[in-house]
């Protein structure tokens, strides 16, 4: 049995196959996911699981060197943005428009859909290296 806390086999599989600068996204329940991008749907009911619960779990498993966030997250959902900053520490933050973020999803290895109902609670995690 796994020793690390993350149990979701789909997320573990994607993260284990990621190389340097590969990307995975975590989104709220309304984020449109491109048909050709792997969807890991965790949404159970409204609000479950939350965006932050999911981000915390993925960060236990993945080395991240940069995150990509929409400008709108900071402007419309400042509490979510502050929580993200607390969780990622010194990781570089790149801001793009929400429309650009949606386009960037097609370059992600997977998009994790949560039950989150907060507007613009979306993030792209760019993989770092552990050495």
Swiss-Prot record:
GO terms for cellular component: cytosol. Its EC number is 5.4.99.62. Pfam families: RbsD_FucU. Pathway: Carbohydrate metabolism; D-ribose degradation; D-ribose 5-phosphate from beta-D-ribopyranose: step 1/2. It is an enzyme of class 5 (isomerase). Gene3D superfamilies: RbsD-like domain (3.40.1650.10). It comes from the Bacteria. It catalyses: beta-D-ribopyranose = beta-D-ribofuranose. The active site is at 20 (proton donor). It is found in: Cytoplasm. Keywords: Carbohydrate metabolism, Cytoplasm, Isomerase. Substrate binds at residues 28, 98, 120-122. One of its GO terms (molecular function) is monosaccharide binding. One of its GO terms (biological process) is D-ribose catabolic process. Catalyzes the interconversion of beta-pyran and beta-furan forms of D-ribose. HAMAP family: D_rib_pyranase. Belongs to the RbsD / FucU family. RbsD subfamily. Homodecamer. This is D-ribose pyranase.
């Amino acid at each position: 049995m796994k020793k690390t806390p993350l149990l979701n086999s789909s997320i573990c599989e994607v993260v284990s196959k990621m190389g340097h600068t590969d990307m995975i996204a975590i989104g709220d329940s309304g984020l449109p996911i491109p048909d050709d991008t792997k969807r890991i749907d965790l949404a159970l009911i409204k609000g479950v699981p939350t965006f932050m619960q999911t981000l915390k779990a993925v960060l236990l498993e993945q080395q991240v060197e940069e995150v990509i966030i929409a400008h709108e997250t900071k402007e419309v959902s400042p509490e979510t943005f502050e929580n993200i900053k607390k969780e990622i520490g010194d990781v570089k933050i790149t801001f793009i428009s929400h429309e650009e973020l949606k386009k960037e999803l097609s370059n992600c290895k997977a998009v994790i859909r949560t039950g989150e109902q907060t507007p613009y609670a979306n993030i792209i995690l760019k993989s770092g290296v552990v050495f």
